[in-house]
Amino acid sequence: MIKKSFISVISHEEKEKNRGSVTFQILSLTNRIRKLSSHLELHRKDYLSQRGLRKILGKRQRMLSYLSKNNRIRYKELINQLDIRESKTR
């Protein structure tokens, strides 16, 4: 597992105040996604972890779409900081 790939964009004081904010939740989901991805590189046949990864990806995608509708500027900044592709609109 690679521990250096985890992100700490938000300072420690902001973490204590804003645990429920959308940006903090997206950040924590991204860390969980990267942790599970590195696990699945070693254990390719761990199908329960693959299912969990898909669930987390869907949850992050819904939160990103919510953020893009409500605060487009913060959405763009967060995508650039986390190095995530922009979602396709349907």
Swiss-Prot record:
InterPro entries per UniProt: Ribosomal_uS15, Ribosomal_uS15_bac-type, uS15_NS1_RNA-bd_sf
Signal peptide: none
CDD domains found in the cross-reference section: Ribosomal_S15p_S13e
GO cellular component terms, A-Z: chloroplast; ribonucleoprotein complex; ribosome
Molecular function, one GO term: structural constituent of ribosome
Keywords for the protein's UniProt record, in alphabetical order: Chloroplast, Plastid, Ribonucleoprotein, Ribosomal protein
Gene3D superfamilies: S15/NS1, RNA-binding
Localization in the cell: Plastid, Chloroplast
Keyword Ribonucleoprotein recorded: yes
Keyword match Chloroplast: yes
Main location: plastid
GO biological process terms, semicolon-separated: translation
Family per similarity comment: Belongs to the universal ribosomal protein uS15 family.
Subunit structure: Part of the 30S ribosomal subunit.
Protein name as it appears in the record: Small ribosomal subunit protein uS15c
